[in-house]
Amino acid sequence: MSWQQRIEAALVQRQHDDAYRVRQSNQGGSGRWLIQGDRCYLNFSSNDYLGLSHHPEIVRAWQQGAEQYGIGSGGSGHVTGYTDAHASLENQLADWLGYPRALLFISGYAANQAVVAALAQAEDRIFADKLSHASLLEAAAQSPATLRRFKHNQADSLQALLEKPTDGQTLVVTEGVFSMDGDTAPLPALQAQCRAHDAWLMVDDAHGIGVLGDEGRGSCWQQDIKPELLIVTFGKAFGVSGAAVLCTEPLAEYFLQFARHLIYSTSMPAAQACALSAAVNCVRQGGARRDALRRNIALFRAGFSNSSYQLMNSQSAIQPLIVGENARALALMNHLREQGVWVSAMRPPTVPPGSARLRITLTAEHQPEDINRLLTVLHHADRKL
């Protein structure tokens, strides 16, 4: 089979499976409203949980940073791309989250890949929650270490793996809040197993940081644990983009020497670091926004009465509605969009086969009438489809 034949066959199969992904440009889609063409939709697909993506202080910080530093970093942080703005943000994050060091990355995907790739050796083991993010599972699978997946959020399943002898080191990886199911990892139980078996714990808290815990310090803070490696990302509650790895001093120095994704990538613009520093302040002072988000979550869950679909047991901003078949999920998504409600369908391979879903995300910017409109449209869809 030629390259062209292989590519065409893969595309045809995706279309046959109702799993073909299509990007659609818009004129603004991070906030309460999504604008596409001449239509304005209530937006229930954005990860801008606290509504900070248009915050004037953050926008102003980016503008001022661009005026001072320019719009590009000019290179890797090991060459010219590490400015006072980057250093200040790293120190700010480390102090806030209670770690000796923080290292900035251009994305959460890059941070996860870099950490696993730099640490894992052939004699090592990586035990990952079965529903961990693709960046974690892919990095582990591509590493020389042995990858095993434990049952989702089940510490006893992890324990069974940890009890098997090994000559190498063991890294346990999980998410704080899971991106497709919206549930929270039992972090104290996982950490207890790690400590009992001399393993390290790595937590990707992309969907918990900014939302959970005192001042939005995240899932680990809320559950009173401190993993060896904490990954936080800035494309959700912070309203920007990028990521950071929180760790010890020796680990940070190790990553500066061996994390190829860090060494060989152009660093984020200094203006972005300025914006993120302002975003950290907004997150820390965002108690009212977190309260509003919690009220919206409670309102949605209390009002949901759609018996044809399964609403996952999630107390987070992510409210997955399990539909099952890909075609049915697409039909429901399109019906909602026809009614002016923008929700996205998640299908395999992003989620397990047979569990296609609408991934509804709530934000602090949503108003009660928005939630009620969503509930009404879902109720009518149950009777129509």
Curated annotation (Swiss-Prot):
Ligand binding (substrate): 21, 133, 350
Keywords: Biotin biosynthesis, Pyridoxal phosphate, Transferase
Presence of keyword Transferase: yes
Catalyses which reaction(s): 6-carboxyhexanoyl-[ACP] + L-alanine + H(+) = (8S)-8-amino-7-oxononanoate + holo-[ACP] + CO2
Cofactor(s) needed for function: pyridoxal 5'-phosphate
Biological role: Catalyzes the decarboxylative condensation of pimeloyl-[acyl-carrier protein] and L-alanine to produce 8-amino-7-oxononanoate (AON), [acyl-carrier protein], and carbon dioxide.
Protein family: Belongs to the class-II pyridoxal-phosphate-dependent aminotransferase family. BioF subfamily.
Annotated protein name in UniProt: 8-amino-7-oxononanoate synthase
Taxonomic source organism: Pectobacterium atrosepticum (strain SCRI 1043 / ATCC BAA-672) (Erwinia carotovora subsp. atroseptica)
Gene: bioF
